[in-house]
Amino acid sequence: MSTGSSDFEKTILVTGGAGFIGTNFVDYFAARHRGIRLIDLDALTYAAHPESFERQAAMPNVVPVQGDICDAALLAEIFEKYDVSGVIHFAAESHVDNSIADPVKFVRTNVMGTAALLDAAKRHWEKTSRLASARFHHISTDEVFGTLGAEGLFTENSPYAPTSPYSASKASADLLVEAYAKTFGLNTTISHCSNNFGPWQHTEKFIPTVIRKCLAHEPIPIYGTGLNIRDWLWVEDHCSAIETIFLHARAGSRYVVSAQCERTNLELARTICALLDRLRPWAGHNYAELIDFVTDRPGHDFRYASSAARIRDELGWQPAGSFEAMLERTLDWYLGHEAAFNQPQSR
């Protein structure tokens, strides 16, 4: 595999490309843009997929690199060696429960790591006279806006009101990105996504947890009453939104990415159980029998829901798949990849 710059029109550094959304994005973008080289920098933490690195190594326009985004020397080496002219920044600790157990770990990766990456980009692009043209796209979350009541939608103008160490760390990273744009002239964009689902998601997350518990015939833990509401987005639709923003959005813009598909946790768990009743019948039982209400977690946000009006109106993006069809596709994927449930848990 050639890594010479002359073989490609540009090189983009993707961080966290062996994680859930990053893995899907690298597969999606690399297939659609053969003339662009992707450098996938991933620390391969517990939530990553080492097999993604193996698959990427065989792709003609992807170079996987294992490393930490907090490693300033490594970042400088990557920017120099590959003459990086764009960044798409996924790498982050993202599980809220883990942020409650170990907030400092989230600050290190999500805040300090973003700062190190911004600084490496600034230094290289100043030196190569690309400060205004080379794009830095930061993947954020709708959780930075806090929680909603029964009505209303988050928009790009919603005030920041994070309620967990995770969302606070992502809000901090967002502000750093905007500060580098205003102070140093970096060409930045930010996207705030709703809850993603699809292949390769770590089994600690809600949908894979429900599937895993069903297949093991174990209790399915549902926090509190199960009436908390989340806004669900098919991961490949998210990938197409990131591609659109990175390639076409104005510098300094922010976009909420949402399919505006709200479900209560209990409703979603029951839907998954009903699908599995059909796809993987359990003799003499229904999977919904396994639903088990457990003590609510601290600071559990009641509702997330976002408007995708700006990205639809300004960039023409919209989700391609229906929630029901994509959820069934997700279940089919996990049923065909049951080894995914052997992923290590947080450490």
Language model features with spans:
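Glycine-rich, flexible loop/turn motifs
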Residues: 49-52, 96, 150, 156, ...
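Generic alpha-helical secondary structure signal
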Residues: 86, 140-143, 175, 205-209, ...
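N-terminal Rossmann-like NAD(P)+-binding domain of SDR-like oxidoreductases, especially those catalyzing
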Residues: 1-196, 246, 337, 347
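Amphipathic alpha-helical recognition patches that constitute DNA-binding helices
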Residues: 20, 135, 164, 205, ...
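Hydrophobic alpha-helix immediately C-terminal to the catalytic Tyr-X-X-X-Lys motif of short-chain
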Residues: 172, 176, 180, 210, ...
